Amino acid sequence: MKINRLFIVACSILTASAFADECVIEVGVADNMNFVPATLEISKTSCPSVTVNLTHSGGLQKSIMGHNWVLSTTADSQAVANAGWGAGLDNQYLPPGDARVIASTDVIGGGESTSVTFDTAGLTAGGDYTFFCSFVGHYAIMKGAFVVTE
């Protein structure tokens, strides 16, 4: 009996741990201007909130080859990136208070890391979402699909 209870408790802990791990996404960037991985997927059911950890493994400083991670709908992504250019580095190349931005990190340079945690309640399973870098000129090639499942 005692062994069965311990087994059930152990399985519960492992299951909770597995769900927690899938709610933390590791994303890498470098001076070559691409995200690794290029597609991200989360489950709203398993992840009421998601943390994205962004790590820049390049060598250039953020004023020269900075990167951030920004999430918006695909329909809004180009307009957000364009508007961000005028906002400047002090504003992370994002218009302050822009409601089209679902989540974003700070701009980081080589050897730095940052993270953002956001709720998934407002996301739609099967919706069309894009993550991208809003640093000037990076949007054209530095973007990926953010897939939301139920």
Model segments located where?
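Extracytoplasmic beta-sandwich strand-turn segments characteristic of Greek-key/jelly-roll folds
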Residues: 75-124
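N-terminal edge beta-strand
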Residues: 21-49
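Extracytoplasmic/periplasmic copper-protein system
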Residues: 21-30, 75-94, 136-150
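Extracellular/periplasmic metallocenter environments
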Residues: 61, 103-150
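Sec/Tat signal peptide C-region and signal peptidase I cleavage site
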Residues: 16-20
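Beta-strand signatures of extracellular beta-sandwich domains
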Residues: 68-72
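Bacterial N-terminal signal peptides
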Residues: 8-15
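Bacterial N-terminal signal peptides that target proteins for export
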Residues: 1-7
